[in-house]
Amino acid sequence: MAKKVVGLIKLQLPAGKATPAPPVGPALGQHGVNIMAFCKEYNAKTANQAGFTIPVVITVYQDRSFSFILKTPPAAVLIKKAAGIESGSGVPNKNKVGKITKEQVKEIAQTKMPDLNAASLEAAMSMIAGTARSMGVEVVD
């Protein structure tokens, strides 16, 4: 018989740097999960992705055990890294803060493909380009 799920927790944590401090501690503590066990496992699995924020979905079971699924980094984080900027524009329609090429958009779309609900790479590319535009990043050929 399958274990009974008692909670789903969604967090965005820096890769390889999860600590029992907030937001991890309180979120997992409510469900009675061993916080240190989660932190060790998460840090081990994300050690090779340093510098990124990795979303994670933690499933907590009735016997206080847990499993988690790592997602791909948010599109905005990948776009900022590709454009070499700290943050997006406050007024994206007026002042542009950076540029990325179609090739970079394609790379980001391929990275994000498992988590996007796009049928094709072209659809994924247009989603990523839209995210870039809303951040004040221009997409150039």
From Swiss-Prot:
NCBIfam families listed in its UniProt record: L11_bact (TIGR01632)
UniProt GO BP: translation
SUPFAM superfamilies: Ribosomal L11/L12e N-terminal domain, Ribosomal protein L11, C-terminal domain
Keyword NAD applies: no
Described function: Forms part of the ribosomal stalk which helps the ribosome interact with GTP-bound translation factors.
Keywords: Methylation, Ribonucleoprotein, Ribosomal protein, RNA-binding, rRNA-binding
Modification after translation, per record: One or more lysine residues are methylated.
Stated family: Belongs to the universal ribosomal protein uL11 family.
CC per GO annotation: cytosolic large ribosomal subunit
Protein name (Swiss-Prot/TrEMBL): Large ribosomal subunit protein uL11
Organism of provenance: Clostridium acetobutylicum (strain ATCC 824 / DSM 792 / JCM 1419 / IAM 19013 / LMG 5710 / NBRC 13948 / NRRL B-527 / VKM B-1787 / 2291 / W)
Quaternary structure (record): Part of the ribosomal stalk of the 50S ribosomal subunit. Interacts with L10 and the large rRNA to form the base of the stalk. L10 forms an elongated spine to which L12 dimers bind in a sequential fashion forming a multimeric L10(L12)X complex.
Name of encoding gene: rplK
GO molecular function: large ribosomal subunit rRNA binding; structural constituent of ribosome
CDD domains reported in the protein's UniProt record: Ribosomal_L11
Domain of life: Bacteria
